[in-house]
Amino acid sequence: VTCDSNPTQFNDKINRRTLIAAAAIAPALIATGVSGANAQAATGTAKVALVTGSSRGIGAAVAKRLARDGFSVTVNCVVNRDLAAAVVAEIETAGGKAVWEQADVSDPAAVRRLFDVTDRAFGGVDVVVSNAGIMRLAPFATMSDEDFDRMIAVNVKGSFNVLREAARHVRDGGRIIALSSSITQLRSPTYGPYAASKAAQEMYANVMAKELQGRMISVNAMAPGLVNTTLFTDGKTTEQIEGFAQRTPHKRLAEPSDIADVISTLCSSDGGWVNGQTIFANGGIV
């Protein structure tokens, strides 16, 4: 179906496709124990989001916010299974729909499985937020090969794995968001390799937006500033953290919910015209 097809014909074809897809996955939904409420998503009556690295921090806030926005959500973790289950429980308690899956994004097979789980649970995916990442800090002179290689494996290769599957799976009209960082502009000492791994997200988003032309999928990078998460605060004293907070015009760190609010807007119908961009949400620190 081309973009200039008759709208009625387009909708009829989409509806037929959706019904066929729903019938095809019904046995899988029963086999995996997905509730009837969750199965409703497979008929196209609900949007579906997959958020990597969403057992805590920004990812958890994004998963919960998108669930409040009406998305069925796949929560992802690497090791924090209890935290991922808790995020799902919170979403379900609030009346939302969610599943969780353990997957290391640096493993292409694990990422494919993550998308397969989402397809089986909800019948497809409309939004992918590539959030999973790690941070290793050291001056160039003392950065170890092991720390550098692991950070590149997760942040650069891992995000590539996620975005590759997103390009294959996200339905037309969807959203793809890769998490960058405002450290690409701050360029602070000890952050060099980490900043480079985050700059890659901006290139990914800009190029992918062009590659997916004609499908009405918007692809952007989100670059948070200083956020009150363990990723940022671990290894820092209270005085150091307060010093960073005072560098922002608002004199505070962002909370994960601040970033989730911006991502929510990008994922809404109002965010479609923002495409191929890097969105800085840093409270004005740069």
Language model regions located:
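N-terminal secretory signal peptides
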Residues: 1-14, 132
